[in-house]
């Protein structure tokens, strides 16, 4: 079945390693890891395929003050990455699926299975030996997480938190917060070992832990390729963005 792609007039040069597959990504360590994760999965099926990760700073990276819950379902983190594909500088863009708006600038051609949908509460080490304070200072971003934290810790002081995973953990170390909410998938992808964590109960974001791949050209070829390689877990998920 995969032999057909070696004869595909568009895909064959990628599959045979004649030209690099150019992947667009945000500049954060997590985003770059996610792009390489996608590349490795394709290389499992096409060993000669190789690629380049081309990074871009997004509006969401530059603006560290706007609360994330106020820009949900926008292209805050995705539009600038998709523009690299639209302009022909990249072939595909790799996103955290939950960053996508309902109508992204590029076509969603694949959505991966979630490596872990759960949210976790990461707290200061001192709370291993003493109870949480009644006015627990918790950093989180989305409305969904805020609602969950409010139900679990009604007296908590919930504050917006922005930045990369590393930035957020640094704020916790600096005691700006008693605890912060994170996606366990992000922690796992970065290979971090955080001993002071609590797994939070559902509901979780339906796209948490998933990657979304977008493109603007040769859509049918890309969609078929990712389905054949079983990188797209469920084709029905693509209809959410169509």
Swiss-Prot record:
Keywords: Porphyrin biosynthesis, Transferase. Pathway: Porphyrin-containing compound metabolism; protoporphyrin-IX biosynthesis; coproporphyrinogen-III from 5-aminolevulinate: step 2/4. It comes from the Bacteria. GO terms for cellular component: cytoplasm. Coiled coil: none annotated. Its EC number is 2.5.1.61. One of its GO terms (biological process) is protoporphyrinogen IX biosynthetic process. The keyword Lyase does not apply. It catalyses: 4 porphobilinogen + H2O = hydroxymethylbilane + 4 NH4(+). One of its GO terms (molecular function) is hydroxymethylbilane synthase activity. Belongs to the HMBS family. NCBIfam families: PRK01066.1 (NF002202). Tetrapolymerization of the monopyrrole PBG into the hydroxymethylbilane pre-uroporphyrinogen in several discrete steps. This is Probable porphobilinogen deaminase. It comes from Chlamydia muridarum (strain MoPn / Nigg).
């Amino acid at each position: 079945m995969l032999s057909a792609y070696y004869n595909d007039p568009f895909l064959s040069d990628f599959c045979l390693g004649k030209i690099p597959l150019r992947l667009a990504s945000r500049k954060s360590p997590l985003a770059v890891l996610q792009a390489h994760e996608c590349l490795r999965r394709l290389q499992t099926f096409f060993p000669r395929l190789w690629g380049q990760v081309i990074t871009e700073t997004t509006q969401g990276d530059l603006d560290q003050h706007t609360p994330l819950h106020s820009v949900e379902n926008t292209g805050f983190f995705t539009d600038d990455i998709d523009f690299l594909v639209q302009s022909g500088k990249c072939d595909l863009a790799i996103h955290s699926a939950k960053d996508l708006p309902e109508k992204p600038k590029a076509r969603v051609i694949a959505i991966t299975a979630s490596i872990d949908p759960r949210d976790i509460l990461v707290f200061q080490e001192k709370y291993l030996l003493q109870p949480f304070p009644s006015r627990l200072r918790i950093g989180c971003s989305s409305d969904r997480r805020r609602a969950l934290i409010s139900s679990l810790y009604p007296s908590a002081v919930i504050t917006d938190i922005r930045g990369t995973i590393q930035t957020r953990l640094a704020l916790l170390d600096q005691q700006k917060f008693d605890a912060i909410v994170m996606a366990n998938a992000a922690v796992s992808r970065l290979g971090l070992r955080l001993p002071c964590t609590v797994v939070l109960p559902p509901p979780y974001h339906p796209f948490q832990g998933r990657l979304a791949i977008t493109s603007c050209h040769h859509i049918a070829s890309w969609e078929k390729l990712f389905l054949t390689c079983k990188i797209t877990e469920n084709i029905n998920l693509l209809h959410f963005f169509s």
